Structure formats: structure tokens, C-alpha cells
């Protein structure tokens, strides 16, 4: 059963993220409205929370930070994240391995 809705655009996986900045730890909290809810230690100042969001998913997928992009919602808690060079199928399989 797929909880995270992953789309694909030009060979890159896209999915929705709801962010809670200034949390006690950086982690994936679980599913949220077809996407994921994450907590970030970083404050939403000077793009720090967006950079930490990218680092979190880069670590999960074993890819370079520069291959993870916040493509919409840079100044919002609701964001769209793109994994460059990762297909939607690969992303879905990874989320399933993580129990998401």
C-alpha cells in the first residue's frame, strides 16, 4: 500500500513534504496528506531549513545533496521536493523500505 504519492517529471521523482522547523530533531515523522511530514532542527531563516530538508532526503536515498531540490514552497511549510536522477518507481520502493 502506497502512502506517499510520488510523481515523475523528466525522470526525476517529485513528492510533497510538510515541514516543521525548529524541532528538537531532524527526522521523517510519517505520512501527511499524500506526502511526508518532516521535522527539522533548522530555523526557517536564510534558507537553512530548505538546505536541511535536502540533506535529510539525500541521506535517505544515498545521493548527493545537490541532487535534491525544493522546487516549490521555498518560503512555506508545504513544499515539493525533487530527487534528480531518481525515478518515481525507485523513490516508491525506497519509501516502502522505510515503512512509509
From Swiss-Prot:
Q: What is the lineage of its organism?
A: Bacteria, Pseudomonadati, Chlorobiota, Chlorobiia, Chlorobiales
What SUPFAM superfamilies does its record include? YggU-like (SSF69786)
Protein's recorded name: UPF0235 protein Cvib_0403
SMART domains (UniProt xref): DUF167
Looking up NCBIfam families in the UniProt record yields: DUF167 family protein
Enumerate the InterPro entries for this protein. DUF167, YggU-like_sf
Name the family.
Answer: Belongs to the UPF0235 family.
**Domain of life per record:** Bacteria
Q: Which Pfam families match?
A: DUF167
Gene Ontology cellular-component annotations: cytoplasm
- Positions in coiled-coil regions: none
Amino acid at each position: 500500500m502506497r502512502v506517499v504519492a510520488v510523481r515523475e517529471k523528466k525522470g526525476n521523482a517529485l513528492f510533497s513534504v510538510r515541514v516543521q522547523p525548529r524541532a528538537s530533531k531532524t527526522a521523517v515523522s510519517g505520512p501527511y496528506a499524500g506526502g511526508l511530514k518532516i521535522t527539522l532542527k533548522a530555523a526557517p531563516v536564510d534558507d537553512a531549513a530548505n538546505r536541511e530538508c535536502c540533506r535529510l532526503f539525500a541521506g535517505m536515498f544515498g545521493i548527493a545533496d545537490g541532487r535534491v531540490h525544493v522546487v516549490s514552497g521555498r518560503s512555506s511549510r508545504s513544499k515539493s521536493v525533487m530527487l534528480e536522477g531518481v525515478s518515481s518507481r525507485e523513490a516508491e520502493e525506497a519509501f516502502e523500505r522505510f515503512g512509509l
